[in-house]
């Protein structure tokens, strides 16, 4: 698991309390069908700019790998929306949170400016874990409670 603040910097380790947990599990075939039905518009609706560039590069090299990438990012966004308690309603939207990779490869959540103020006012760090295997993709997100001004969780 990894954590990133809304600004994209990895926060220091803290004894934060859990504010929310989200999980999503989906069949990769569901994403394949959506791409077949809606084409690139589907990926453009779901992915942020950096995710979209990575998706397109992976799909060019290996179409199946591109679909798995899109499925894990879809699952991460669903899991994040559940962890923060909003679902897919404002200020949360598909493109306002991206799952990118830290230099070592671990997945990190990067929250866009449109959502960052809302998130930072309520929460501390967000942690994400994603996986795909065979015909399934899954993501778990844990959101920490915002620490008290005196530093206590």
UniProtKB/Swiss-Prot annotation:
Reaction(s) catalysed by this chain's protein: apo-[ACP] + CoA = holo-[ACP] + adenosine 3',5'-bisphosphate + H(+)
Co-factor requirement: Mg(2+)
Entry's Gene Ontology molecular function annotations: holo-[acyl-carrier-protein] synthase activity; magnesium ion binding
Binding positions (Mg(2+)): 24, 78
Alphabetically ordered keywords of this record: Cytoplasm, Fatty acid biosynthesis, Fatty acid metabolism, Lipid biosynthesis, Lipid metabolism, Magnesium, Metal-binding, Transferase
Gene Ontology cellular component terms for the protein in this record: cytoplasm
Keyword check for Cell wall biogenesis/degradation: no
EC number: 2.7.8.7
UniProt cross-references to HAMAP family, sorted A to Z: AcpS
Function: Transfers the 4'-phosphopantetheine moiety from coenzyme A to a Ser of acyl-carrier-protein.
Protein name, entry field: Holo-[acyl-carrier-protein] synthase
Native species: Bordetella pertussis (strain Tohama I / ATCC BAA-589 / NCTC 13251)
Recorded name of the encoding gene: acpS
């Amino acid at each position: 698991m990894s954590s990133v603040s809304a600004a994209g910097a990895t926060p220091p380790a803290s004894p934060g309390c859990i504010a929310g947990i989200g999980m999503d599990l989906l069949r990769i075939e569901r994403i394949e069908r959506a791409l077949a039905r809606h084409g690139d518009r589907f990926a453009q609706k779901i992915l942020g700019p950096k995710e979209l560039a990575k998706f397109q590069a992976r799909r060019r090299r290996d179409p199946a790998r591109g679909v798995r990438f899109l499925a894990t990012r879809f699952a991460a966004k669903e899991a994040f929306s559940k962890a923060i308690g909003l679902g897919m309603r404002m200020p949360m939207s598909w493109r306002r949170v991206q799952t990118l990779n830290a230099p070592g490869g671990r997945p990190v959540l990067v929250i866009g400016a449109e959502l960052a103020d809302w998130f930072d006012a309520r929460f501390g760090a967000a942690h994400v874990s994603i996986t795909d295997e065979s015909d399934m993709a899954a993501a778990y997100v844990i959101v920490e409670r915002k620490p008290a001004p005196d530093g206590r969780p």
